[in-house]
């Protein structure tokens, strides 16, 4: 069975897409963003293609593309569409698959369903991206508690940001969830720099090793 990883975060704008690009590039994986909110600037799928050095055939089209950069439920309402969360199913592919959510776990897709509800149905391992700055201990532990309460498997925590040794130590200690590594903020964000940073800060074998 091909490896599938769900990338979520403790908040929005913390680096999930950059981490997703790094992981997808390292595994030569497929990438899927089920719902994209906001189309005026580069989409997350376009960013991943650029940063991961992936072929466009490795990017699975979004199930919903919404115009307004807002929570998916609100974007859908503005666009006068309704997201059918029951129709969201993990794609079948012939290589590893990286799935990126939007914002945090409790971001609503509709007025009845949040991302964590869908993740609970999928039962695929989650990688939680977390900031290293002030406030992240509380946010990360709350997110892990929510995943645990729904029996969603968690592969580990991927920190994003400046090195904070105690923060990166105490969260795994209190939660029992392992630290996968830390992706530093890069002064020059390009495919080569991202590839090198991922190699230096993460063990590819944790994710099952690189694919041909």
Curated annotation (Swiss-Prot):
Pfam families: AAA_26. ATP binds at residues 13-18, 100-103, 184-186. The active site is at residue 33. Keywords: ATP-binding, Biotin biosynthesis, Cytoplasm, Ligase, Magnesium, Metal-binding, Nucleotide-binding. One of its GO terms (cellular component) is cytosol. Its EC number is 6.3.3.3. InterPro entries: DTB_synth_BioD (IPR004472), P-loop_NTPase (IPR027417). GO terms for molecular function: ATP binding; dethiobiotin synthase activity; magnesium ion binding. Its cofactor is Mg(2+). It is an enzyme of class 6 (ligase). It catalyses: (7R,8S)-7,8-diammoniononanoate + CO2 + ATP = (4R,5S)-dethiobiotin + ADP + phosphate + 3 H(+). It is found in: Cytoplasm. Belongs to the dethiobiotin synthetase family. Catalyzes a mechanistically unusual reaction, the ATP-dependent insertion of CO2 between the N7 and N8 nitrogen atoms of 7,8-diaminopelargonic acid (DAPA, also called 7,8-diammoniononanoate) to form a ureido ring. Homodimer. This is ATP-dependent dethiobiotin synthetase BioD. It comes from Brucella anthropi (strain ATCC 49188 / DSM 6882 / CCUG 24695 / JCM 21032 / LMG 3331 / NBRC 15819 / NCTC 12168 / Alc 37).
């Amino acid at each position: 069975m091909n490896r599938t990883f769900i990338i979520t975060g403790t908040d929005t704008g913390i680096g999930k897409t950059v981490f997703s690009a790094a992981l997808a590039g390292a595994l030569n994986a497929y990438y899927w963003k089920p719902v994209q909110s906001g189309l005026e600037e580069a989409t997350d799928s376009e960013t991943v293609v650029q940063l991961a050095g992936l072929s466009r055939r490795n990017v699975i089209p979004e199930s919903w593309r919404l115009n307004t950069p807002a929570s998916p439920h609100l974007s859908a309402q503005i666009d006068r569409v309704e997201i059918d969360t029951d129709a969201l199913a993990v794609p079948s592919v012939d290589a590893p698959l990286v799935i990126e959510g939007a914002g945090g776990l409790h971001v609503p897709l509709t007025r009845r369903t949040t991302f964590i509800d869908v993740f609970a149905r999928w039962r695929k391992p989650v990688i939680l991206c977390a900031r290293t700055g002030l406030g992240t201990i509380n946010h990360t532990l709350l997110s892990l508690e929510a995943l645990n309460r729904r029996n969603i498997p968690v592969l580990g925590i991927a920190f994003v940001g400046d090195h904070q040794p105690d923060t990166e130590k105490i969260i795994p200690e209190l939660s029992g969830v392992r630290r996968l590594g830390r992706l530093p903020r890069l002064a020059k964000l390009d495919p080569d720099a991202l590839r090198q940073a991922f190699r230096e800060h993460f063990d590819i074998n944790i994710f099952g090793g690189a694919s041909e």
